[in-house]
Amino acid sequence: ATADKIPLITINHGRTDTTDGRVFPYIFPLQLNPYSEVSAIVNYIGQQAGGLDKLKGKKITVIYHGSPYGKETIPIIDLLAKKYGFQAKHVEVPHPGNEQQAQWLAIRRDKPDWVILRGWGVMNPVAIKTAHKVGYPANRIIGNIWSNSEEDVRPAGDAAKGFLSITTHPSGTQFPVLQQIKQHVIDPGHGNLPAERFGTVYYNLGVVNGILNVEAVRLAQARFGVKTLSGEELRWGFEQLRFDNKRLKEVGALGLLQPLKLSCADHEGGGAVRLQQWDGQHWQPVSDWIQADRALLRPI
């Protein structure tokens, strides 16, 4: 991307260090990087406990995919454990994660207050089903950004009821931009996906991605002219992204997309999540936007 000067949009994923656009000028982990992800989850757990100071003495276990992605946040969890006084444990699940009996039996013995699931693919429903089998409650498990879709919970059946996860793009069709898509695309039959997919987590991620891309192009063309943009010009457009609540309301995405402010040095721009809970059929929002501790994380 850097050699070719073509922006690479790694929305909600990619290595955390690519957040610094001064070092990685053409990579944009928009909205949420892995460090922000776990920081926001810990902040939510603190909120549920009655304040971050109440985390002292609590037990938080992270069960993670055995890959560089899964391991990336281990030092951040340990840093937050030291800061707030909770006990952190890390449990690895080798890829692909279709056998987790030993890991969840160990978790049950340890009796953590919360489990953070940093999964991938088949690992997610297997984790939920195995937790249920050994008696660990689903409503004390919080899935990360790769453990938050309908596809992650439906295969687990009733065991998934109560399971929590984070999201940067809540499911649902109530947002004005989704209603416009329904009116102009879905209802006239111009869509190319099953109707039940409309408004799901991954569908709404696509909508958010589209909003961010179009806004970056709009800003760049306002500066450089309505033409085919170069990679350098489009990079400039992404670095000018500004979404406050006023602008989010204008594009019909208030509540669907978090407030964002990007810059040359900050290619994430947000660092917030919402919590959602699976009721057996749909995800239900259970929190407003919860911000990561970016002041702590950015120097790292």
Model-derived segments and spans:
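Short helix-terminating capping/connector loops at secondary-structure junctions
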Residues: 52-57, 136-137, 195-197, 226-229
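Extracellular/periplasmic catalytic domains that process cell-envelope and extracellular macromolecules
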Residues: 1-5, 21-22, 54-55, 108-110, ...
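Segments of small-molecule ligand-sensing domains
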Residues: 190-203, 214-285
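Venus flytrap/periplasmic-binding-protein-like
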Residues: 9-10, 16-19, 96, 137-156, ...
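A structural signal for well-ordered alpha-helical segments within the folded catalytic domains
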Residues: 39, 125, 207-215, 232
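Extracellular/periplasmic Venus flytrap/periplasmic-binding protein
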Residues: 16-17, 25-135, 172-179
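Sec-exported extracytoplasmic/periplasmic mature domains
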Residues: 2-6, 46-50, 78-82, 86, ...
